Curated annotation (Swiss-Prot):
GO terms for biological process: translation. Belongs to the universal ribosomal protein uS9 family. GO terms for molecular function: RNA binding; structural constituent of ribosome. The keyword Cell membrane does not apply. It comes from the Bacteria. It comes from Burkholderia cenocepacia (strain HI2424). This is Small ribosomal subunit protein uS9. Coiled coil: none annotated. Keywords: Ribonucleoprotein, Ribosomal protein. One of its GO terms (cellular component) is cytosolic small ribosomal subunit. PANTHER family: RIBOSOMAL PROTEIN S9, SMALL RIBOSOMAL SUBUNIT PROTEIN US9M.
Length: 130
């Protein structure tokens, strides 16, 4: 705990989010912007708010987030993971409910690298029989 802030780091794909939460009125600031201005997709906003809604803390915390790397979906997943870890730092009794919802586990899926001799990671050149 840093002062009266609770901290959590979240990661998803190549995105990393540093999340700070403290008691407040429910403001979420991402990279200096309100969350609705930062994330344009409604699904991204929903993903970020999932752990707060699950624990009924939607309007009880002010959240500051620094996130970099990746795209919008990866950043939203990283912020969700960071908020989850910060909530656990705030109150460890929330961990079972967050864990059963699958928010504590880091999504380890990464982009598969392109292989030599193939067009993409798995896509080969079109095969011609004749």
């Amino acid at each position: 705990m840093i002062g009266n802030w609770n901290y959590g780091t979240g990661r998803r794909k190549s995105a990393v989010a540093r999340v700070f939460i403290k008691a407040g009125k429910g403001d979420i600031i991402v990279n200096g912007k309100p969350i609705a201005d930062y994330f344009s997709r409604e699904t991204s906003l929903m993903i970020v708010r999932q752990p707060l809604e699950l624990t009924n803390h939607g309007q009880t915390f002010d959240i500051k987030v620094n996130v970099n790397g990746g795209g919008e979906t990866g950043q939203a997943g990283a912020v969700r993971h960071g908020i989850t870890r910060a909530l656990i730092d705030y109150d460890a009794t929330l961990k079972p409910s967050l864990s059963s919802a699958g928010f504590v586990t880091r999504d380890a899926r990464e982009v598969e690298r392109k292989k030599v001799g193939l067009r993409k990671a798995r896509r080969a050149k079109q095969f011609s029989k004749r």
